[in-house]
Amino acid sequence: MELTEDGTLESYIAFLDSNPESPLRPQAEKQIYNLYTQKRTVEVYKGFIEEFQTNQYIDSAWWNWYQVELIRYDSSVFNFFLEETDIPFKEEIRLDQKLFSAKFLPFSTAGEFGFMDVTGEVTIPAKYEFANFFQEGLAIIVQNGKYGFINKRGEIQI
């Protein structure tokens, strides 16, 4: 990839324009994504989606744009992505929308913590050493002696 020796976004774009069938295309697309989205803002993810629609990392751009918007933790985020975008993760967003208003409560059994909804149904199995209440969609947990945050799907976020 002599054309990309300087490591700039422009050089990777030029490489793909000159060599669209190159076996190095996946690596070049990854570099384009990484360079273009370095700032990790809504604007750069939107720009990437508009400019690089055939890039293999477009789904990552969509997902990261959605994640950045979720920082506001406002129900309008779900409606915006469902109604006004072509995001490929509509089902995941519908689930997040449903979980947004769900109340999860920590519980303890056999020395481990998990979460249940207000009807008592277990929503996240007890597997944590400690769990706190959800606030703005995240709950502090301790697992294997390490602190972190989980979302209402039970996925580690931080």
Specify the residue positions occupied by each region the protein language model found.
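Residue-level detector of conserved, function-critical positions
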Residues: M1-S11, P23-I158
